[in-house]
């Protein structure tokens, strides 16, 4: 009996050793891949070690109020010859100054002067920084809390039909929003907003759009306003009213990513659900992809964006825990 057992063990021992070595190799490979941050199959992960708090850094944000709002009305109908319609939405009386054919180089030199030399809080300050390197200027007074449509157009006697071939030395239109009352400039951290707008012409027919928006702060910094990518709520029926509400919500998110905040109270029907648990409210922005798709409970379990699979370098919350507690209804 013992002899038969020893013979059987001798016959199967090579297969047993091979299986043990192969299993050890798979486990070791999984641990090494996980240590260096590569994707590892879920079966090799320890359920108690799926939080990546040491990998993803939480970016400290400072929220400030943005008194300016600017959008393009009917961008499909805009052109150099027919002009463009802009819609403003400002919290205080403001001035909208439009510069046609503004020099690209002089504009970015002006932004640097805002940081190192003098603050651009008035149209005259920007014009001094630009050294009048623009073709035409027009200015409009904007009343507070009133959405006004402003029609801007180059004079016909200029006979400008395009701004040359790409790459260009001039932007078609640069719109500057500043506070009209000097006292209001002491209230807000954001003292002006510069919008770079592309308008199609005979040479370059790219559709009309806002290329860049820069928020200029009283402390001397300026920040590029970036769009967040958020999935739409499918339970929500589109209408004219709902469209305006979505725009207001999107605007507040855009302002927050550019170090600004709009006092728009989030309604229940406009709330966005987490793409993972489908329950929690979306609150975290993942960088650098800018997908806004995770709630407070799920963000700690992800090292890669669940939308695009890009590795998350930094993240920040749209609302602090205190703000969320205020929004929650009190129950007895």
Swiss-Prot record:
GO molecular function: zinc ion binding
Tissues where the protein occurs: Ubiquitously expressed with high expression in testis and the cerebellum.
Pfam families: zf-C3HC4_3
Coiled coil region boundaries: none
Keywords assigned by UniProt, alphabetized: Cell cycle, Endoplasmic reticulum, Growth arrest, Metal-binding, Nucleus, Zinc, Zinc-finger
Induction field: Up-regulated by endoplasmic reticulum (ER) stress triggered by thapsigargin or tunicamycin.
GO biological process: negative regulation of cell growth; negative regulation of cell population proliferation; regulation of cell cycle
Matches recorded under SUPFAM superfamilies: RING/U-box (SSF57850)
Zn finger residue spans: RING-type: 274-309
Places the protein is found: Nucleus; Endoplasmic reticulum
InterPro entries, alphabetized: CGRF1, Znf_RING, Znf_RING/FYVE/PHD
CDD domains, A to Z: mRING-HC-C3HC5_CGRF1
One cellular component (GO) term of this entry: endoplasmic reticulum
Role noted for this protein: Able to inhibit growth in several cell lines.
Xref: PANTHER family: CELL GROWTH REGULATOR WITH RING FINGER DOMAIN PROTEIN 1
The protein's name in its UniProt record: Cell growth regulator with RING finger domain protein 1
Species, as recorded: Homo sapiens (Human)
Gene: CGRRF1
